[in-house]
Swiss-Prot record:
<keyword id="KW-0220">Diaminopimelate biosynthesis</keyword>
<dbReference type="Pfam" id="PF01113">
    <property type="entry name" value="DapB_N"/>
</dbReference>
<dbReference type="InterPro" id="IPR036291">
    <property type="entry name" value="NAD(P)-bd_dom_sf"/>
</dbReference>
<protein>
    <recommendedName>
        <fullName>4-hydroxy-tetrahydrodipicolinate reductase</fullName>
        <ecNumber>1.17.1.8</ecNumber>
    </recommendedName>
</protein>
<dbReference type="GO" id="GO:0019877">
    <property type="term" value="P:diaminopimelate biosynthetic process"/>
</dbReference>
<comment type="pathway">
    <text>Amino-acid biosynthesis; L-lysine biosynthesis via DAP pathway; (S)-tetrahydrodipicolinate from L-aspartate: step 4/4.</text>
</comment>
<keyword id="KW-0457">Lysine biosynthesis</keyword>
<feature type="binding site">
    <location>
        <position position="36"/>
    </location>
    <ligand>
        <name>NAD(+)</name>
    </ligand>
</feature>
<comment type="function">
    <text>Catalyzes the conversion of 4-hydroxy-tetrahydrodipicolinate (HTPA) to tetrahydrodipicolinate.</text>
</comment>
<feature type="binding site">
    <location>
        <position position="159"/>
    </location>
    <ligand>
        <name>(S)-2,3,4,5-tetrahydrodipicolinate</name>
    </ligand>
</feature>
<keyword id="KW-0028">Amino-acid biosynthesis</keyword>
<keyword id="KW-0560">Oxidoreductase</keyword>
<dbReference type="GO" id="GO:0016726">
    <property type="term" value="F:oxidoreductase activity, acting on CH or CH2 groups, NAD or NADP as acceptor"/>
</dbReference>
<feature type="binding site">
    <location>
        <begin position="168"/>
        <end position="169"/>
    </location>
    <ligand>
        <name>(S)-2,3,4,5-tetrahydrodipicolinate</name>
    </ligand>
</feature>
<feature type="binding site">
    <location>
        <begin position="10"/>
        <end position="15"/>
    </location>
    <ligand>
        <name>NAD(+)</name>
    </ligand>
</feature>
<dbReference type="InterPro" id="IPR022663">
    <property type="entry name" value="DapB_C"/>
</dbReference>
<dbReference type="GO" id="GO:0008839">
    <property type="term" value="F:4-hydroxy-tetrahydrodipicolinate reductase"/>
</dbReference>
Length: 277
């Protein structure tokens, strides 16, 4: 099979440049397009040159549909508004769309689900293999430890430039904990504590958010009991782990029928992992 041709959207950003470098270095994939917003100072530049790997003869442009039409897939770590737009273009082009964008609203999620009728979409709050394995462990722990005996708190820290909170990864881990306890996260989530809050409500899942410096991503799920605590953690040291996970997801999705998938499908933790091609 020929190398999978991938488009990098948001090519001028930190993650976009990481994706360009990662795809260029990995076997089985190649960069065939790079997209930036209209008016970006990066338009017209070579994507490889921008990413520091030399000329790769891929010019950064602002015409996604024409580029998508000549590609096999798109890697997307942009903004909610842009991701919804790219999902529509990917559906028109009938290609793979890997989404690592966080901060999506319910309306955004619905638009992406609609696009998945025509595109093969893999979406996750975190593309790293380690975090997705962690989510499985969190679900198992939450199921095994009774809510009356163990409280669940999720602590996350990211760099000072991150704009959404809690992080998509923290919410992914919260959903895993909620699934383990057979509850709805929306009903039991506690995002803010300030002033006189009263005692902790049993069965809730708390979130604490830290921002500062250049931290790539740190997440801990704390199951706190009487006299003991279990802490399940993941520390991201390099954005490349997210890029490699996204490429793995794209290769997994290639040739599969349209639909909406997660990294748990890619890693073989769900029934969808064996979906017929």
């Amino acid at each position: 099979m020929n190398d999978m041709g991938l488009v990098i959207v948001g090519a001028g950003g930190r993650m976009g440049q990481t994706l360009i470098r990662t795809v260029h270095a990995m076997e089985g994939v190649r960069v065939v397009g790079a997209i930036e917003r209209s008016g970006s100072p990066h338009l017209g530049r070579d994507a490889g040159e921008l990413a520091g790997i030399g000329i790769i003869n891929v010019e950064i442009c602002d015409e996604p549909l024409s580029v998508f039409a000549k590609a096999d897939g798109v890697l997307d770590f942009t903004t909610p508004k842009a991701t919804v737009e790219f999902a529509g273009y990917a559906a028109q082009a009938r290609i793979v769309h890997v989404i690592g964008t966080t901060g999506l609203s319910g309306e955004d999620e619905a638009a992406i689900a609609a696009a998945a009728r025509h595109a093969t979409i893999v979406k996750s709050g975190n593309m790293s293999l380690g975090v997705n394995l962690l989510s499985v462990l969190v679900k198992q722990a939450a199921r095994a430890l009774d809510a009356a005996d163990f409280d669940i708190e999720i602590l996350e820290m990211h760099h000072r430039h991150k704009v959404d909170a809690p992080s998509g990864t923290a919410l992914l881990l919260g959903e895993a904990a909620a699934e383990g306890r057979a509850i709805e996260l929306a009903d039991k989530s506690v995002r803010v504590r300030d002033g006189h809050t009263g005692p902790r409500e049993a069965g809730t899942i708390g979130f604490a958010t830290l921002r500062g410096g250049s931290v790539v991503g740190e997440h801990s799920v704390i199951l706190a009991g009487i006299g003991e605590r279990i802490v399940l953690s993941h520390l991201a040291e390099d954005r490349t782990i997210f890029a490699r996970g996204a490429v793995k997801a794209a290769l997994w999705a290639r040739g599969r029928k349209p639909g909406l998938h997660s990294m748990l499908d890619v890693l073989g933790f769900t029934e969808n992992s064996d979906q017929a091609r």
